[in-house]
Amino acid sequence: MLKKLSVTLSLLLITVGLLAACNSQPAAAPQPSQPEADTAPAEEAETKTEADTASAEEAESETAASPGGDLEVFSYWTSGGEAAALDALFSTYKDEYPNTNIINAVIAGGAGSNAFAVLQTRLAGGDPPDVWQTHPGAELYGRYVDPGYAAPVTDLYQQEGWLDKMPKQLVESMTAEDGEIYAVMVGIHRGNDLWYNKKLLAEHGLEIGDTLSFDQFIQMADTLKEANIPALCVGDSGIWASAMILENNLISALGSRYPGLWDGSVSFEDPAVKEAIEQYGQMLEYQNEDHAALSWDQAAKKLIEGGCAFTVMGDWAYGEFVNANLKDNEDFGWIDFPGTQDYFDLVADGFTLAKDAPNPEAAKAWMKSVNSLPAQEAFNPLKGSICARTDCDRKKFGIYHNWSMDSFASDTVVPSIIGGAAAPADWQQAYFDGVTQFVVDKDVDALAQSLAQAAQDAGISQ
């Protein structure tokens, strides 16, 4: 059952101080029986040597206790920004557990479009990786918990004190009906962002304020079209990228009623749904001609190079911008997707532990490591997401991240079908299939009807 998220971030800062001082005075002339002043330095040196030895033995013991063998980490983080962020998790883990050999089992394809099929085949065949990338909500339950592939990690939350350091509603989205928690989240993405090339817009006399309406976007798109510049960068070789534009239009058109699409309280034949589809179709009139040949990150690269002006994408796109050495709010800008300024479209990333993990000790150590403060403060600035923990230091994050943190704290959080939280896998695929057909025929009524049928087939229609 979908768990609705509406959360508030609190930020805790930790300060550590270290003090050390040591001094002694030399003795006068030696006497037959040495005075106490002479023996103090020797005793101190002996104590220091014993302490150093104990420290070395402790470090050696910790290294020996580090889990060994291979640890297979399955994910679909392959773009430049994603790979850099994943490497940060690997580095943090290796610092803590140097005896483990990490196998980076990565499958290319945004939003897990290819990875899901590979992973499901392996899980069904009894050949699981130790840990795999996952999203909370419907995806976690339907794909992994209900079939019995996932192991609970509730004990880690209790032992490490994580329940006090994670948004309650986020934890609930990882908690199954048996009361067990089945995932660890490493970052929280915002899916309703509209990114733009600031310099390109400035060259054409276009300026964006604090908000942008749909009509204002269309006006800018027309201005760019006159200059033979595609307004919208799209890379839908994986159709989910185009489906995300529709998702944002649905949030814009339905507002607070949007989550009702996924629990059956709002019909896909609602007039607001058709309005959203019409706006989606209108936006596609301004997309780049080579959209079907590009992946989402290639579309982001096209924006970076000035080949088009805007892209609708979750803030994993931020990772591509900084990986290309672009500067926040100088080379690129961002704004709420038109009409969604009071909402946070949540796409959370994390990992699930295999029930029959080949190396359970190393796998559990991975789950512990990725939810540590050092790991999340290293991973999220590169990935574009904000910490899943509530105690990360805001000073370690840039302008965009702090903007996103504020949005997460104050706006209404809604589930994403692209991010796996809103609907089961079959429903998600039907949504993608409907979008695929719409990109070809632009038939508003047909798409609305196909989505309504998909909801009925999933048992969540009115």
Q: What residues fall within each predicted segment?
A:
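Conserved C-terminal helix/tail region of periplasmic/extracytoplasmic solute-binding proteins
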Residues: 43-52, 57, 148, 202, ...
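Hinge/lid segment of periplasmic solute-binding proteins
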Residues: 58, 65, 135-191, 218, ...
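Extracytoplasmic/periplasmic substrate-binding proteins
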Residues: 76, 90, 139, 243, ...
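Extracytoplasmic/periplasmic substrate-recognition and gating elements
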Residues: 91, 95-96, 101, 125, ...
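Glycine-centered hinge/linker elements that transmit conformational signals in sensory
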Residues: 220-223, 263-293
